[in-house]
Amino acid sequence: MSHRDEAQHNPPNLIFTYGTLKRGFANHGLLQSLFSTNDAAFLGTYRTAEELPLVCGPHGVPFLLNFPGSGLGRHRVRGELYAVSDHGLTRLDELEGISVGHYERLPIRLLPDGDSSIGGGGGGATVVEAEAYYAHRSFAEDMWRRNGWLGFEVYTEEACKYVRRALRPKNRSFLEDIRLFVSSSS
């Protein structure tokens, strides 16, 4: 079955991106290649319905943390929503290191960006159910602590100083980089 046939039989997967997969960022090329095979489509800019922490880890890699709530360090994170085929989802999962414990893909509730309402009451925006790549639970709490329990609303390369994979040290794994990062002081 071709990817186009697959898309006709399976509903698309809705994926919220908040970091390097966004337009203009280092890993957006993967989504562009998926656009060319009809395995992905841009749906618009959105923000999280719940306040969540978004932080930077080693090499300026962004991590959304699955710690919903309100208060200092949590924001309605802004990003982009994509419809992705099953083939496209497999490619994104590979990039995000799902099988090796870098991220985990979990449900997320979104609102269209620019809508000031929050889900319900008085003509509020329709909440969209999607999935996002969150920091793996094995290190998320340490990542939150290492960032001083402060997150940000939108990922920018200027704030995080992202380092492309090709320019990172080759003598250790990304999980080792994460362990070193969370065990160091700021």
Where in this protein do the model-derived segments appear?
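Glycine-aromatic micro-motifs
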Residues: 2-186
